[in-house]
């Protein structure tokens, strides 16, 4: 991969993320870098398969080099630090090819994390409102503000009806079809990057072909007893590997890679080799 330059983030970025639940970085990857990511993505996908929904995923072993490249990229690290603080922990790099519509959903309806989780999505194909770009409801992540201020836990969530992707649309919330729910489209070109928490309500409709996405996922370092218990519970739900840091990160000469895994190791998550 070509050398990647750093791009600083300001307090405004943090406040924007906190208010609306997402950040958009246009052209964060150069055309040359994007072509390299596309080639790596396609190689990874050759190792995987498609599920019943037509979603293609690569294997963990096949993503090892891409994982290393992106986790050590200062731009990914800057975004994670801006949102989660300087002790963010690495979760995963995933390659996914979406071939069908993705219904409205957000993690907080079904799988709640006591620590904040950040998804940084790199899009490799042109996507607009007519071809399956991400649609979001700005501010809908505020259900997760309960993590920052317990008073939020007392507030009702008027959007709960569409947080579960398995909602039965035969009797749609508010009498609206899923495509009619008010939204903001986040149209992207290859090399653009979106950052958002899984608590943000999002979907994609009008898909006209595979939507190639690379996601880099980070976790706020669990500190409280509740957060630590919750992290271990999610790791168990994820087959015991979800939060196990890569061995090559733990042993790396790069201090930034060691730093984004040391917290999980200290909590007893055993490193895993590919």
Where in the sequence are the language-model features?
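Non-heme Fe(II)-dependent double-stranded beta-helix
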Residues: 1-20, 25-114
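Short, conserved beta-strand element in jelly-roll/cupin
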Residues: 112-129, 187-188, 195, 217-221
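Conserved hydrophobic/aromatic beta-strand scaffold that supports enzyme active sites
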Residues: 6, 22-24, 119-123, 183-185, ...
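Short edge-strand/loop segments of extracellular domains
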Residues: 98, 137-144, 218-223
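Double-stranded beta-helix
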Residues: 131-201
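Non-heme Fe(II)/2-oxoglutarate
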Residues: 47, 193, 199-274
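A short secondary-structure junction signal
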Residues: 102-107, 130-136, 145-149, 206-207, ...
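A short beta-loop-beta micro-motif enriched in histidine and acidic residues
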Residues: 107-117, 181-182, 188, 209-210
